[in-house]
Amino acid sequence: MGSITDDEVIRKRLLIDGDGAGDDRRINVLMKSFTKWCHSSFSPEEGMSQYQRMMMSLAQCEFSMGKTLLVYNMNLKEMENYEGIYTDIEKSIASAHEKIAECKKEIQRAKRIRKNRQEYDALARVIKQHPDRHETLKQLEALDKDLQQLSHIKENVEDKLELRKKQFHVLLTTIQELQQTLENDEKMESDDTQDSPMENGD
């Protein structure tokens, strides 16, 4: 009766251990059971029952080892995949920094254009105070053309800057979604590891 109780305890421990850290203990328990089976006097029925239990434990060890190896290989492939993703992210971030630097230069250029336009406006007001001079009118027309060109350049710079801001926002959103996906994958793997004892129990 005591032997049956010990076997039940061993079986429960094997079921609770599942994959991972309990494998070493499962093997140690199997070795102890084998030693006990070799040096104890059992009736044929008890000996056969003990033998079948040891074979079941051995099969569990082999199954756990195969499953662990499979998970290990899958993790290696996932790590290679993640490394590729991280490399792409790093390249995207570097590209984003370059675009930001370019946008800053465009902003400085737009500020200079604005300053020049203000100076041109001030000069135009002075010129308008002398409309009777033919040469002054010619200069005013030239200034108007320059103002139109500068205004067009400024609009183009502002449009390009707005586009860069939108592209950078999309990039940051993509990076955040990817990080969330990776965290979800890690959580799912953790949940699968916790649920594996229940699967072995079934």
From Swiss-Prot:
Query: Quick check: keyword Coiled coil in the entry?
Result: yes
Cysteines engaged in disulfide bonds, as pairs: none
Its localization reads: Cytoplasm; Nucleus; Nucleus speckle
Q: Which InterPro entries does the entry mention?
A: THOC7/Mft1
Keywords of the record: Coiled coil, Cytoplasm, mRNA processing, mRNA splicing, mRNA transport, Nucleus, RNA-binding, Transport
Where do the segments described as Disordered lie? 181-202
Coiled coil spans? 86-167
Quote the function comment for this protein.
Component of the THO subcomplex of the TREX complex which is thought to couple mRNA transcription, processing and nuclear export, and which specifically associates with spliced mRNA and not with unspliced pre-mRNA. Required for efficient export of polyadenylated RNA. Plays a key structural role in the oligomerization of the THO-DDX39B complex.
Assigned protein family: Belongs to the THOC7 family.
* Protein name as annotated: THO complex subunit 7 homolog
Query: Origin organism of this chain?
Result: Danio rerio (Zebrafish)
Q: Give the taxonomic lineage as stored in the record.
A: Eukaryota, Metazoa, Chordata, Craniata, Vertebrata
